[in-house]
A protein has these predicted regions:
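Short amphipathic alpha-helix that is part of the acyltransferase structural core
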Residues: 1-32
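A short, internal acetyl-CoA/4′-phosphopantetheine-binding micro-motif in the GNAT/acyltransferase core
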Residues: 59-70
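Conserved GNAT acetyl-CoA-binding A-motif
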Residues: 85-98
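Conserved acetyl-CoA-binding loop-helix of GNAT-fold acetyltransferases
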Residues: 70-83, 107, 160-165
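Conserved beta-hairpin
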Residues: 36-50
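Nucleotidyltransferase catalytic core that binds NTPs
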Residues: 96-344
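Short coil/loop residues immediately preceding or within conserved phosphate-binding loops
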Residues: 37, 59, 144
C-alpha cells in the first residue's frame, strides 16, 4: 500500500473531496445522490482510487477506479468501514452488491440473505436474520389462513384501521409488521404503540416489529425518499424486499396472503406493490384493498402529518382513531421536537 493514503471524505464540507467522489461514482455508473453519513477514500497522490460509504450500518457506494482493480483496494475500504462500525458498537451490518461479488463478501464473513438478477443482499454479525426468524416463530399462531400487513403507520389512521378490518375479514389470523426504521415523523416506538392501541380491541391480530428485514433502509431505502426516489432503483430494491418476505418471513409464520392498500398517491409504493405481485407469483396471494376516503379524499398519513404540522387539529382529528389522537396528545407529540421530516 506504499504511496496510498486512506482518509475520511467530508462530502458535506470539502468541495474537492465531493468532486473527486462524484467523479468516481459516475465513472462506475452509480448514483452520486445516495444517502451516506460516513465516507472514506483511498488516494494515490491527488487521485481518488477507491471509496466506500456507510449509511447507518449499511455498506454502500463501494467503488474502485478501473486503473486500480488489481491493487486489492476494495478489501482495504471494506475493512476500514467494518472497523468504523465496530467502533460505533454496530455488530450487525449489511451490504448491497452485485452477484459477481458473492465470493468476495462471503470470504469476509457475510451471509447471503436474498438475491435478484441485479442485486445481492448480505449480512454480517449479530443479531442475525436467523435470530429474527426465531423471534417470529415464537409468536406464531396456529390458524387455517394467516395473513400479513406491513405498515409504517406514521401515524396510525382510520385508513390503516380499515385495511386491518378488511384483511381480518379474509383471514383467520393477521400479523401486522410495523416498520422499525427510525426515519419518519413519528419514532418507531411511537408508531408501534399507536398500532398496538389502534387494534387492541380486535381478536386474532399480532403486532410485530419489522426490524431490518422489511421496508427498511437495508432492504428498501427508496421508500424513505418518496417522490425523490429513482423509480428504476426503487424497482430493483422492491424486488429484493419482496423476495425476503416470500422466501423467509412468510414461511416462518405460514403466511398465505399479504394485504396492501391501493396506492393512488405514491409512485414508490405503487412500484413496491407491483414488485410484490411479481415476486409472489402463484406462491403467495396478494390482495390489494381500496383506500378509505373521507370528504372525497383518500385518508393518508401524509394528509394527517400535513395538518399536524400546520396546527390544524380539526383537519386531522377525524382522520385517526381515538386511540391515535389520545396517544399523540398524552405523549406531547405535537411539538416541533418530534418533527423528523418536513411534509413537502
Amino acid at each position: 500500500m506504499d504511496g496510498y493514503v486512506t482518509r475520511r471524505l467530508w462530502l458535506d464540507r470539502d468541495p474537492q473531496a465531493l468532486k473527486d467522489w462524484q467523479t468516481l461514482m459516475q465513472a462506475a455508473k452509480l448514483s452520486d445522490q445516495e444517502r451516506v453519513d460516513y465516507t472514506i477514500g483511498i488516494y494515490d497522490g491527488a487521485r481518488l482510487a477507491a471509496t466506500g460509504s456507510l449509511d447507518g450500518k449499511i455498506l454502500k457506494c463501494l467503488v474502485v477506479c478501473a486503473a486500480y482493480q488489481s491493487e486489492n483496494l476494495l478489501t482495504q475500504v471494506v475493512m476500514a468501514l467494518l472497523e468504523r462500525l465496530d467502533q460505533e458498537g454496530l455488530t450487525n451490518r449489511f451490504v448491497y452488491t452485485k452477484p459477481k461479488n458473492l465470493p468476495y463478501f462471503k470470504a469476509l464473513g457475510f451471509r447471503l440473505l436474498a438475491q435478484t438478477e441485479a442485486l445481492l443482499f448480505m449480512e454480517q454479525g449479530f443479531p442475525s436474520f436467523q435470530d429474527y426468524l426465531s423471534y417470529l416463530t415464537q409468536h406464531k399462531v396456529d390458524s387455517s389462513q394467516n395473513g400479513a400487513i406491513v405498515m409504517n403507520a406514521n401515524p396510525f389512521t382510520l385508513g390503516h384501521r380499515y385495511l386491518v378490518e378488511q384483511a381480518l375479514s379474509a383471514c383467520g389470523h393477521l400479523y401486522i409488521f410495523v416498520v422499525s426504521e427510525d426515519r419518519s415523523y413519528f419514532s418507531a416506538q411511537d408508531r408501534f404503540k399507536m398500532v398496538q392501541a389502534g387494534v387492541a380491541d380486535l381478536a386474532n391480530v399480532t403486532v410485530l416489529p419489522s426490524r431490518d428485514y422489511m421496508v427498511s433502509q437495508a432492504t428498501f431505502p427508496s421508500y424513505f425518499l418518496k417522490e425523490r426516489a429513482d423509480l428504476a432503483v426503487a424497482q430493483v430494491q422492491a424486488e429484493l424486499d419482496a423476495q425476503v418476505f416470500k422466501q423467509f418471513i412468510a414461511p416462518s409464520l405460514e403466511i398465505a396472503v399479504r394485504f396492501v392498500g391501493e396506492e393512488p398517491l405514491s409512485p414508490v409504493t405503487q412500484v413496491y406493490n407491483q414488485a410484490l405481485a411479481q415476486a409472489f407469483g402463484q406462491d403467495l396471494d396478494l390482495k390489494i384493498i381500496p383506500r378509505l376516503e373521507k370528504d372525497g379524499q383518500v385518508i393518508s398519513a401524509t394528509r394527517v402529518r400535513a395538518a399536524i404540522q400546520a396546527g390544524k387539529l380539526a383537519d386531522w382529528v377525524n382522520l385517526v382513531p381515538q386511540s391515535t389522537y389520545h396517544y399523540i396528545q398524552s405523549q406531547d407529540l405535537l411539538g416541533q421536537d418530534v418533527q423528523r421530516e418536513k411534509v413537502e
